[in-house]
Amino acid sequence: MALDRNIFSVPNNERSIDSFKARLVSGGARPNLFEVEMDFPSGVGIFDDEIENTTHRMMIKGAQLPASNIAEVIVPFRGRQLKVAGDRRFDPWTITVVNDGDFKLRTAFERWANYIIKVSDGSGTINPTEYFSNWTVNQLGRAATNLAETGKSSGATLPILRRYSMKGCWPSAVSAIDLNYDTQDTIEEFQVTLQVQWWEAYDASNTGSVV
């Protein structure tokens, strides 16, 4: 195989920190700039209106942008292994929730789980379309500023850089909250594991899936 000599012809200034800075669009995406849009099934009946839903988005302090997984199929051939594409796999999606004093979100997830299978007798809704719902995680960008004019952000809304719509979610686990006399300077939080059928990704324009 011939050596590509073009790799030796890259100017030194293309390897500089300034060159790297110019390619780091918007200063890079930040893992602490995100929000989760909630959509509980109507049968759960937890939120009174969209304003309350929007308010409680702030209580979700941890989430993930989903992985893209394709299983491999190994086909043996004369002592070698041919690896071909298998089936898609979608990992469970875990979020971390801050537990505020009214237990609103914990109640919502406990009701959702109870809506699927009741803790008392094992009955529940049998139609998946009634307990599936679509959740969304938004990667946010940093708001643009114009210090010369206002000294403040040019807009109150952080831009959405990427949006992932998690399809057919339902909670398979709502974690325990540990209690202890020794714990100080801490607010309760808990994790929820949501099973996902598939996901779709959208760019900032939100005009169609980018995948």
What are these regions (language model features)?
Residues M1-V211:
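Glycine-rich, low-complexity intrinsically disordered segments
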